[in-house]
Amino acid sequence: MKLSEFVKAEYGKSISECTNEELYYALLTLTKKMASGKQHGNSKKKLYYISAEFLIGKLLSNNLINLGIYDEIKEELAQNGKDICEIEEFENEPSLGNGGLGRLAACFIDSIATLGLNGDGVGLNYHFGLFRQIFENNMQTTVPDPWLTEKSWLTKTDVTYDIKFKGMTVKSRMYDIDVIGYNNTSNKLHLFDVESVDESIVEDGINFNKEDIKKNLTLFLYPDDSDEAGRILRIYQQYFMVSSAAQLILDECVAKGCNLHDLSDYVVIQINDTHPTMVIPELIRLLVERGLEMDEAIEVVTKSCAYTNHTILAEALEKWPIYYLKKAVPQLMPIIEVLDDKVRRKYHNQEVYIIDGEERVHMAHIDIHYSSSVNGVASLHTEILKNNELHHFYEIYPEKFNNKTNGITFRRWLLHCNPQLTELITSLIGDGFKKDATQLEKLLDYKNDEKVLKQLLEIKSAKKMELKKALMEKQNVTINENSIFDIQIKRLHEYKRQQLNALYVIHKYLEIKAGKKPSTPITVIFGAKAAPAYIIAQDIIHLILCLQQLINNDPEVSPYLNVVMVENYNVTWAEKLIPACDISEQISLASKEASGTGNMKFMLNGALTLGTEDGANVEIHELVGDDNIYIFGDSSDTVVERYAQGSYHAAKYYNENAAIKEAVDFITGEELKAIGDKDRLERLFNELVFKDWFMTFPDFDEYVKIREQAYADYENREEWVQKMLVNIAKAGYFSSDRTIEEYNRDIWKLED
């Protein structure tokens, strides 16, 4: 059905007579109708991809692209004086995720559907997400981030389950979002919500009564866990998600004729990080309840589950006190004790026990012992897991460990966010790359084609203008579109080292003040949210915002250097920032970033990576070669060794390196104190000088040197654009379609 006919039937008027809001809701309804007619994966075995987050982004354009009607709709709207981008402004971005974990899950379910595989996502229907970030007085403040409207991509289902906690039962209801594959199957994202949820209990900012479980359970993603009530709420939340999922899985299996003894022939559960771990003991509990012996239930569940590890950070490998679990979900503890007892009888090594000497349950240990597969998400990360962090487990289960390097959906991160580049690529090599991203390699034939290289630069300039316009409209910030766009966008964490980037900005500011001006102006752009309880991360944001105010208002410096921090960084912002970027900052401390996927998105859009040998940067480096990437910093081996020996002392670097001392002293100098919060700046200064846990200082000199090298190379436009082309051509490996094909081949074994 043409849009004009649908609009006529819906509103009784033509497209040109409709408001943009009416057209948005018409397109929403039409798209959902078309998705419902798509075939769902129907193999005997089904995947359930369980994740605490799905950072899916706005869905309208993405769904129209995947249905194959985007160009047709865009053209029909344009003929009636309507702009699809303006219509999309009426869509709220779903507040269902925060960082790379959630974005990866979103890319994966897109690829699962595109490949025609039988697999659904399972998560929670958060009402307010993490939070909406607002900058006030150069500080991050937090308010709820509502996204649910009466009409949305969510469809309420009749599926409900009783979820039993200690002393109470709550009802969960399933809501579905269609996951439309590219010219293929349509699957589901199942999101569970508590029926008794009450948005009105949120008070000032994002504060609420953490103990009112019946009302608060699905309000926020990752509720503040700086106190006991917050930590126990996380257990309630996680159990609510996995108990709903487990009941759904068993119901769907029985409906297919499965006798539960053969569960693993019908089901594979991918556990995305440790948040869904309790699905293992919960499934065992339910199977025993339904008549299986304990040992058989354990065996069946182990065969059915697979675990993805996303981090080596100890803080993120969840360990819950037994006391918390008994307070919230006492019915799970007998199962967990049985699982631990089995491990203790077999392996006499307390490093691999599930319950430790401090009466804590290690969630990752449950996942490793009672899953059939354990995977890392980049080759370096997987090697670190095998040789260091999870070495004791690797010695026990070498056959379980495997690598699945992360990927991204090219539908969103190229076709949707950079249609100009998509059009150019299609004109050169055809559209086969849309289904087989490795075909991008054909672009290498054009490495010396002046016309093509000129078009690439023109597209980059156009995307810079679009970003300039967006920043002006959204934040009233002006940037120079002819400057180098140097961008770091990711969750705020010390290991990702936004503080290193900020120290470089100070260094550059002082250089310009001393008369050393760059040949081409530089715009340094940040986007990041800091967890409300993560004080130092908030202090780093404060420093960046103070630098933004200081530098952008300095007439001596601002013609050459600008700093911008985008407010409330999310997928929608990423879609504007990534195509406009020249230099992609991927500067985590080597060994700490499992993979990263922002690095892949930037590469695909022709940005050059400036980074450490960490995560997927290693594989990008291998693909593009030394000449097309900017690598600096200590190796992961050096870093791991330094931690092991306890040999790093930040104060020594501070006292012995004049450039470091000058930049760090500036944090508490008069200029910043005049506009910033003295306590925050001093706390950050002390953290860097006396702790610097993520080793900013050892990499500082090399970082300055390589960044200056990148800026110098940018001056040679012909060579720079050739580097851009090589990066785009080599990005095909990082398609999430490739990643999902590997998961299916090695772990899931679904028929397509």
Predicted regions and their residues:
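A conserved ligand/cofactor-binding region detector
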Residues: 1-752
